[in-house]
């Protein structure tokens, strides 16, 4: 039995050992798993805490870090890792204050650093950055290496810095493959930066010193949609003809506050929607400037020198919704009759502002759409036959300043003794509307020193050569004056002429390149200026002006006469009053005045009732005449205790005042209650 038990015991011992070993191994593995889980949880919590930690000087809200307007000189180093937008504007941060660990914040996409103390383009920026605001700093250079560190950048704002053309490194934007918006307003640029990225959609270069735009300035910018060049030094002579025609996708072009005398040639027409040309010196617009601009919605020509517009200028503008024409010297003659009809026809769809007439005189200040009878005269003149009759019936201002000379941009004056002019001794009649002529001109003297010239060309011409000669002067001495006028013009104003002089005015059609048309004879007309001092001229001007023209002068004369008469009446009244006052002064007697009883209390002086009782009228005055006046005072003695005399002469000190003195020199008030 013992042996059997021992054997059984020996048999079960290994199995129990194996079971215990398995249990211990399982327990060890569970402990390791728990420790690993705990370590992982601690690391996760640490990362979460670190990512949500906000700098003490800032405010954080779902990835938006607000550290602006804090007076910081450097960016806080403990920026959360989940930050997406950093507001750091209006501080004093310089380039040394941008920490290197900022580029490790891979979630940051927008940084606002405007109005700080940066003098170089920052380099420690995260590669994930897509929008950067650096306005109102002192950044002077743009290096390729700086932009290469932020290849995903889409919007770059560098307004109000010190960037110049030479400080932009060549191919600085070569690595900016996604840049769509570039603002360089109010810097020191003298030309368009080169090497701009092809992805650019909006470019602002306003308020710089750009004076020249070469042909290749916008080469490759096929995606550009908005271009702003306001406030520069641009003139027509320094802009290449096809500069803007390459920008086929452009929808907005702004050339405000420049020195343009006419809109630039070959503007993009396919997709242009907004065209801003205000605040220039534009005096004429070629008739085909706005051709094929069927998408144009807004056109601003305010604050220029426009007096007229060519017929058909707006024919292709089917989508035009707003037309601004303020502050121009519009001359509302027959040449603008088409514009009046166009404004009336498109009144429901086009908002026209500022089309106010500055001449002729009788329509000054009127909106062109409200003019009726004045322009209807143009129809009457045309129906009576002959362009000469039309010129006679057309109302023209008597002031030469009302019409700005046309073609001034191309004007040149030269002495050409060999110019083909007819003999000055022949009396040349006014040109008539003969159908055989290719050019008909009409002249009309306006004032003693100006003549208005209008013409009509039967065939299109690139330009006209206009010449004039004062009779009595030989062409050999160089008195012929000429100018080149654009082919789309129909009128010209000669000024600074001699009064009471006869002029021969000739015009000839020019070919391309400003050469004379073969076998083309000049068309001439003769006109005589009025006498600047002649009474006949004055009478004629008054008759032409109508019966109402003399009213302002009559009003001025009548007002002056009435004013002189009023001064005479007032002078007579003043003289009479002065004389009457002297007579009354001599007869009137003035007496000394005595104060009322209440005046003592009002003046703060106590009355000695124990001594005097004064009775008298209210107010008396001291006489001017030396004779003695009657005494009007009644003095009653009340026998004071000291028995001193109460009578005082006129020479006694204090006589006539509110405070009397006794003979001993002691005031009465000191004895009032003794």
UniProtKB/Swiss-Prot annotation:
Location of this chain's protein in the cell: Cell membrane; Endoplasmic reticulum membrane; Cytoplasmic vesicle membrane; Cytoplasm, Perinuclear region
Glycan-modified residues: 305
Residues on Extracellular side: 52-552
Cystines in this chain: 54-60, 58-67, 332-357
Bilayer topology term: Single-pass membrane protein
Keywords annotated in UniProt: Cell adhesion, Cell junction, Cell membrane, Cell projection, Cytoplasm, Cytoplasmic vesicle, Developmental protein, Disulfide bond, Endoplasmic reticulum, Glycoprotein, Leucine-rich repeat, Membrane, Phosphoprotein, Repeat, Secreted, Signal, Transmembrane, Transmembrane helix
Regions that span the bilayer: 553-573
Main location group: membrane
GO CC annotation, single: cytoplasmic vesicle membrane
Protein name: Leucine-rich repeat transmembrane protein FLRT1
BP terms from Gene Ontology: cell adhesion; dendrite development; fibroblast growth factor receptor signaling pathway; neuron projection extension; positive regulation of synapse assembly
LRR repeats: 81-105, 106-126, 127-149, 151-175, 176-197, 198-220, 222-246, 247-269, 270-292, 293-316
Gene3D superfamilies assigned to the protein according to its UniProt record, in alphabetical order: Immunoglobulins, Ribonuclease Inhibitor
InterPro entries given in the database record: Cys-rich_flank_reg_C, FN3_dom, FN3_sf, Ig-like_fold, Leu-rich_rpt, Leu-rich_rpt_typical-subtyp, LRR_dom_sf, LRRNT
Organism: Mus musculus (Mouse)
Assembly description: Interacts with FGFR1. Interacts (via extracellular domain) with ADGRL1/LPHN1 and ADGRL3 (via olfactomedin-like domain).
């Amino acid at each position: 039995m013992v042996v059997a038990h021992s054997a059984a015991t020996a048999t079960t011992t290994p199995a129990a050992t194996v079971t215990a070993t398995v249990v211990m191994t399982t327990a060890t593995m569970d402990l390791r798993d728990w420790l690993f889980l705990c370590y992982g949880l601690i690391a996760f919590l640490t990362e979460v805490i670190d990512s949500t930690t906000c700098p003490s000087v800032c405010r954080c809200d779902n990835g938006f870090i607000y550290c602006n307007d804090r007076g910081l000189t450097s960016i806080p180093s403990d920026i959360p890792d989940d930050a997406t937008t950093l507001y750091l504007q209006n501080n004093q941060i310089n380039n040394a204050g941008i920490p290197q660990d900022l580029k490790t914040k891979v979630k940051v996409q927008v940084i606002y650093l405007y109005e700080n103390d940066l003098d170089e383009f920052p380099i420690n920026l995260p590669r994930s950055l897509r929008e950067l605001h650096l306005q109102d700093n002192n950044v002077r250079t743009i290096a390729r290496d700086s932009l290469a560190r932020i290849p995903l950048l889409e919007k770059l704002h560098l307004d109000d810095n010190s960037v110049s053309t030479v400080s932009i490194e060549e191919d600085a934007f070569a690595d900016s493959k996604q840049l769509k918006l570039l603002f360089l307003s109010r810097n020191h640029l003298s030309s368009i930066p080169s090497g701009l990225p092809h992805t650019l959609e909006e470019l602002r270069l306003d308020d710089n010193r750009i004076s020249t735009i070469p042909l290749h300035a916008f080469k490759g910018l096929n995606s550009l949609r908005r271009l702003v060049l306001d406030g520069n030094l641009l003139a027509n002579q320094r802009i290449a003809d096809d500069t803007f025609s390459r920008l086929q996708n452009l929808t907005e072009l702004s050339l405000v506050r420049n020195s343009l005398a006419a809109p630039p040639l070959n503007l993009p027409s396919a997709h242009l929607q907004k065209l801003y040309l205000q605040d220039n010196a534009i005096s004429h617009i070629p008739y085909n400037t706005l051709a094929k601009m069927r998408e144009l919605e807004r056109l601003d020509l305010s604050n220029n020198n426009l007096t007229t517009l060519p017929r058909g200028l707006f024919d292709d503008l089917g989508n035009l919704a707003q037309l601004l024409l303020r502050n121009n010297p519009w001359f509302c003659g027959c040449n603008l009759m088409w514009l009046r009809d166009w404004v009336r026809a498109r009144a429901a769809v086009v908002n026209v502002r500022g089309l106010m007439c500055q001449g002729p005189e009788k329509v000054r200040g009127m909106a062109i759409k409200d003019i009726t009878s004045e322009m209807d005269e143009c129809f009457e003149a045309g129906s009576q036959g002959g362009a000469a009759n039309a010129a006679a019936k057309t109302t023209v201002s008597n002031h030469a300043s009302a019409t700005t000379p046309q073609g001034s941009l191309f004007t040149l004056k030269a002495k050409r003794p060999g110019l083909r002019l007819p003999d000055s001794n022949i009396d040349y009649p006014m040109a008539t509307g003969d159908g055989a002529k290719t050019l008909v001109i009409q002249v009309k003297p306006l004032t003693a020193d100006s003549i208005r010239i209008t013409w009509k060309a039967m065939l299109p011409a690139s330009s006209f050569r206009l010449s004039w000669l004062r009779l009595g002067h030989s062409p050999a001495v160089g008195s012929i004056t000429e100018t080149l006028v654009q082919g789309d013009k129909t009128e010209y104003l000669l000024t600074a002429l001699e009064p009471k002089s006869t002029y021969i005015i000739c015009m000839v059609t020019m070919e391309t390149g400003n050469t004379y048309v073969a076998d083309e004879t000049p068309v001439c007309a003769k006109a005589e200026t009025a006498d600047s001092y002649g009474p006949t001229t004055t009478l004629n001007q008054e008759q032409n002006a109508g019966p109402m023209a003399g009213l302002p002068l009559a009003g001025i004369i009548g007002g002056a006469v009435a004013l002189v008469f009023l001064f005479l009446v007032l002078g007579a009244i003043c003289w009479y009053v002065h004389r009457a006052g002297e007579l009354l002064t001599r007869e009137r007697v003035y007496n000394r005045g005595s104060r009322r009883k209440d005046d003592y209390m009002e003046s703060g002086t106590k009355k000695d009732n124990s001594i005097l009782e004064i009775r008298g009228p209210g107010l008396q005055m001291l006489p001017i005449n030396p004779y003695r006046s009657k005494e009007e005072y009644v003095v009653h003695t009340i026998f004071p205790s000291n028995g001193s005399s109460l009578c005082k002469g006129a020479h006694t000190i204090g006589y006539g005042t509110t405070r009397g003195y006794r003979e001993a020199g002691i005031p009465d008030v000191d004895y009032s209650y003794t």
